[in-house]
Amino acid sequence: RKSLAEANITSKDVCFVNAHGTATHDNDKVEGIMLEKIFGQQIKFLSTKGYTGHTLGAAGGLEAAFTAAALREGWIPASAGFVQQDENIPVRPITEQTQINGSFAVSTSLAFGGNNASIVIAKD
């Protein structure tokens, strides 16, 4: 919410989220609850981590670059590696390449010890 406020936009202005998506039960559950709470169940989201693996310290920057590229190109790829919806996660990632139309996207990063960040990326 803080990153949306700092960008002077609302959740309805965001066309997709590139979620941190660690593929661990607890982290994915918390992130899914957060996505649903802020953006609603219909938010388009994916995690690009399935394409790159966890790049540790480079993850946030790499995911932000993918987010900017997707926003520029007008489409997001399917979430690679997604197999089955966890009943405790209230939102579902996209499972096929999806066209997007909007000016803003969000990339999230969740780190060990509770260091969490999100960045709003705007399309020119």
Describe every region a protein language model picked out:
Residues 1-124:
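Conserved "HGTGT" condensation-loop signature of ketosynthase/thiolase-family condensing enzymes
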